[in-house]
């Protein structure tokens, strides 16, 4: 991934996949929805997309083989239709599955929610997977970037934010870090974002709560934006992408780039 232009990354929230409680047995419908949302991001002028198994709640810490297989099929179909750089995030924290899928379809990056440290989540205690991921990257070398959350949302953290950020980079091997609010769609703490930008030797992305009202404030303190709630119909995460909202945000980003 290139971050010199502060990329706008759209989240494709997938409906339930095989292996999750909500799966209805229609993978073709999942594929159609994913391609439709991805195409809207592309038409709107976004710079990249990331696929996420958002519909698989309640989440497990890692996913089964059937989910990995189905996710790979969906991601490959999206890649065939969409020209944008593509990322993979496998909830809740399956970095091995995410990298494996990304490697198999030649995706560009993955997102890891807990790369280092410990997060107290609704799935219980989630531990970092940096060592396992580093070993896999050695066995399957590629140019896939690792974008890692620092104090990921929907979790409680007892570590110091600055130490957690530096550990994620220096000990976890993150190629970029992500700062989020406390929940999906919630705004980031501006002081945490400023701190991250000040001390991080790698790009810093805003990972939640981005909208036309606050992106101007975040612009100077970030190197990119991951957006998935405000750009949906009615601003609801589970809805389809709104081409009008996505276009509005993309045009605003373009104007900010132009100064």
Swiss-Prot record:
CDD domains, per the entry: TIM_phosphate_binding
InterPro entries assigned to the protein according to its UniProt record, in alphabetical order: BtpA (IPR005137), RibuloseP-bd_barrel (IPR011060)
Top-level taxon of origin: Archaea
Annotated PANTHER family: SGC REGION PROTEIN SGCQ-RELATED, ZGC:162297
Protein family per UniProt: Belongs to the BtpA family.
Name listed for the protein in its UniProt record: Uncharacterized protein PH1209
Organism, as annotated: Pyrococcus horikoshii (strain ATCC 700860 / DSM 12428 / JCM 9974 / NBRC 100139 / OT-3)
Source lineage: Archaea, Methanobacteriati, Methanobacteriota, Thermococci, Thermococcales
């Amino acid at each position: 991934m290139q971050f010199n232009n502060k990329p706008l990354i759209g989240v494709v929230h997938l409906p339930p996949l095989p292996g999750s409680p909500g799966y209805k047995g229609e993978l073709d419908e999942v594929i159609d929805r994913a391609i439709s949302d991805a195409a809207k991001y592309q038409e709107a002028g976004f710079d990249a997309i990331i696929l996420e198994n958002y519909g698989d709640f309640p989440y497990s810490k890692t996913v089964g083989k059937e989910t990995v297989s189905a996710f790979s099929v969906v991601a490959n179909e999206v890649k065939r239709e969409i020209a944008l750089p593509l990322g993979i995030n496998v909830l809740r924290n399956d970095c091995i599955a995410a990298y494996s899928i990304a490697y198999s379809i030649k995706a560009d990056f993955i997102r890891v929610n807990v790369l280092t440290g410990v997060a107290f989540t609704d799935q219980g205690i989630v531990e970092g997977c940096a060592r396992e991921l580093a070993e896999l990257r050695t066995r399957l070398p590629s140019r896939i970037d690792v974008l890692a959350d620092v104090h990921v949302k929907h979790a409680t953290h007892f570590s110091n934010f600055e130490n957690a950020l530096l550990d994620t980079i220096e000990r976890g091997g993150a190629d970029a870090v992500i700062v989020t609010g406390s929940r999906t769609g919630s705004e980031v703490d501006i002081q945490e974002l400023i701190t991250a930008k000040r001390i991080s030797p790698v790009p810093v992305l805003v990972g939640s709560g981005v909208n036309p009202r606050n992106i101007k404030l975040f612009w100077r303190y970030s190197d990119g934006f991951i957006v998935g709630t405000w750009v949906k119909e009615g601003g609801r995460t589970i809805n389809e992408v709104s081409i009008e909202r996505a276009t509005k945000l993309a045009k605003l980003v373009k104007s900010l780039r132009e100064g």
